[in-house]
Amino acid sequence: MNLKEKTRALFAEIFGYPATHTIQAPGRVNLIGEHTDYNDGFVLPCAIDYQTVISCAPRDDRTVRVIAADYDNQVDEFSLDAPIVTYDSQQWSNYVRGVVKHLQQRNNAFGGVDMVISGNVPQGAGLSSSASLEVAVGTVFQQLYHLPLDGAQIALNGQEAENQFVGCNCGIMDQLISALGKKDHALLIDCRTLGAKAVSMPKGVAVVIINSNFKRTLVGSEYNTRREQCETGARFFQQPALRDVSLEAFNAVASELDPVVAKRVRHVLSENARTVEAASALEKGDLQRMGQLMAESHASMRDDFEITVPQIDTLVDIVKATIGDQGGVRMTGGGFGGCVVALIPEDLVPAVRQAVAQQYEAKTGIKETFYVCKPSQGAGQC
């Protein structure tokens, strides 16, 4: 039974009437462009075929009822006429409540909804299960009540909910790719203008995601430290964001910066340039150049931004040794664990799977999880 069938069946069983709509919003993987989003830079993600699915129907009152199928059918119920506050003992509820609260501030022309939510985006793997949920909930209200909101506004609304209501700092990339993803394409996103350009993926290329299953512990505190270091760098150059600093300008005065801040700035500037070049390499089907850029990106995250861990570096080395120059591999996501992403010819997938299975656990004591994904469509009815 797929997620659509599962949520529709549960909806009818619990609420006693059929759902009118089923909405999906995908998770994502970022091919290149790491920690560039909050510096107003470029990212190159694609939506993946793992998603949050919500079966839903409008109500004729002002109540929102939510069932979380993946959490033993836990229930959340709240009124649109009372202040929406956090639900401290049920964390998933806060993503729903935050989205609805921020939607009210954007466009209050909607009423109550019944919904049943289920998803298969791996959690805690850096594949944006939370953004997928936020965009799915926003799309539910937009579709049921014909709200005049486009994908970018639904994405911004989800980001606001996560930053201000849930209390987790994040850039705009995760929500934007979930809302705007295009089948068989990656999107080159300008995080300043929110402009997105579809970049076709070469035929016969697989997007492989391997979760290191190394438990991320530092991610929150270190993420915020990296943001502060980048802001310090932008202030040094008297620019609103590192997006506005050229590598030439940086190289001329790098020795005057705090050495750690200088390394952080160099990563962001070089990563931005790599990301723009990667989009054109991908468009041309130049997997060899894409592989070089991904390797440079990983080295920069390891040495300049210092967000990889030995387990992730081991995974990257195993994959790289298997594929040579036929494609690329790098850490993806916030860092300190999580996943690596590889772009490889489909016929190399079995060899990569085998090499990782034979070597990763032997070297680290941790068993990986292996996903082969397709670049998928963004949020909408399913």
UniProtKB/Swiss-Prot annotation:
BP GO annotations: galactose metabolic process
Keyword vocabulary terms for this entry: ATP-binding, Carbohydrate metabolism, Cytoplasm, Galactose metabolism, Kinase, Magnesium, Metal-binding, Nucleotide-binding, Transferase
Top-level EC class as recorded in UniProt: transferase
Domain of life according to the entry: Bacteria
EC number: 2.7.1.6
Residue numbers binding Mg(2+): S130, E162
Chief localization: cytoplasm
GO molecular function, one term: galactokinase activity
Positions contributing to substrate binding: E34, H35, T36, D37, Y223
Pfam (any one): GHMP_kinases_C
Ligand binding (ATP): G124, A125, G126, L127, S128, S129, S130
Catalytic activity: alpha-D-galactose + ATP = alpha-D-galactose 1-phosphate + ADP + H(+)
Pathway recorded for this protein: Carbohydrate metabolism; galactose metabolism
GO cellular component: cytosol
Chain's role: Catalyzes the transfer of the gamma-phosphate of ATP to D-galactose to form alpha-D-galactose-1-phosphate (Gal-1-P).
Name listed for the protein in its UniProt record: Galactokinase
Organism from which the protein derives: Salmonella paratyphi B (strain ATCC BAA-1250 / SPB7)
Source lineage: Bacteria, Pseudomonadati, Pseudomonadota, Gammaproteobacteria, Enterobacterales
